[in-house]
């Protein structure tokens, strides 16, 4: 079973109306199709193929990570618009230097998947390549994906990186 936001739904509304904003899906035994388990049909996110491919990768690698969080943190996404930050580990080092918690919550740093069409198999494949080395992957000009053993672990990585990005933005604006 998987719980994902619905197509066109926003995470900020899940708390107040979960069953109107989320889709619960059951994958068939042979993995060839899924059923939506809900009183009201909510079509799953268009990024479902990426999420499922990431889960398949994690299971195949025997990783303990069971949760995939994908969100669109404004300051982190903004940083991916700067080509210099897209080079290997540049963004990680900048964000680690902002507050000590960033290295504590995200010790591997973050990988970068170059721009691809959201929901595409190519984007999923690029993300999986990065997950060999990182637990957080930025999707250039789109969002972030984090994996964790539980929801809190995955969320905390993105939240802490977002805080560091906001601090970086504020520090730069001060001159």
In which residue ranges do the predicted regions lie?
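Glycine-rich flexible loops
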Residues: 1-175
């Amino acid at each position: 079973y998987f719980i994902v936001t619905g197509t066109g739904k926003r995470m900020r509304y899940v708390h107040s109306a979960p069953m109107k904003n989320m889709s619960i899906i059951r994958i068939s035994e042979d993995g060839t199709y899924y059923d939506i388990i809900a009183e009201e049909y909510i079509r799953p996110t268009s990024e479902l193929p990426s999420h499922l491919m990431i889960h398949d990768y994690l299971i195949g690698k025997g990783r303990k990570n069971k949760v995939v969080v994908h969100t669109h943190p404004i300051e982190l996404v903004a940083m991916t618009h700067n080509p210099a930050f897209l080079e290997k580990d540049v963004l990680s080092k900048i964000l680690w230097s902002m507050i000590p918690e960033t290295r504590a919550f995200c010790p591997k740093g973050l990988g970068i998947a170059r721009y691809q069409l959201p929901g595409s198999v190519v984007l999923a494949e690029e993300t999986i390549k990065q997950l060999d080395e990182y637990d957080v992957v930025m999707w250039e000009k789109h969002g972030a994906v984090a994996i964790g053993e539980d929801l809190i672990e995955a969320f905390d990585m993105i939240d802490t990186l977002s805080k560091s990005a906001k601090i970086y933005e504020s520090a730069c604006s001060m001159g």
